Amino acid sequence: MSTAPKTLADYQAPYPEATPNQKRYVIFLEEKDYDSELEEYKLQLIPGRVMKVDPVNRCFIAGSVKEKTIPGWGYNYYVVEMGPMATTLMAVSPGSPPVRKFVPMAERPFIPYNSKLPVVVYMPKEGELHYRVWTPTKPKEEIAGER
């Protein structure tokens, strides 16, 4: 396996600069064999913010993740727009102090795993990007039976 480039500049692609209200995240994925990348691996983007919230309710942030393409290159990048936070309405014990924690967006898209290109994501400045790499623990194919 070859050593993957470690900077966005190594790709010589004209990815846009982040606007003054954005920050740009770049993820370099570990190289896998071609068929595995296509069939087994997926990358999940988990945008969100670190916020003070009560310790009981489940919270999430409204918003969207839009896929865009560099014209003439075919390289994709993602732009995150974040909206307000929503929460469940369970009662909180009196005196429970708020806690700082990462609150994810409701939309957490799965995108193809491709180690040949960087994953470039533009987020609002107050946002934070987490991600997960998904793969089957044990490749197993079965045929469903009739009952």
Curated annotation (Swiss-Prot):
A Pfam family that the UniProt record links to this protein: Ecotin
Domain of life, per lineage: Eukaryota
Gene Ontology molecular functions: serine-type endopeptidase inhibitor activity
Gene3D superfamilies per the UniProt record, alphabetical: Ecotin
Family membership noted in the UniProt record: Belongs to the protease inhibitor I11 (ecotin) family.
Record protein name field: Ecotin-like protein 2
Organism per entry: Trypanosoma cruzi (strain CL Brener)
Upper lineage: Eukaryota, Discoba, Euglenozoa, Kinetoplastea, Metakinetoplastina
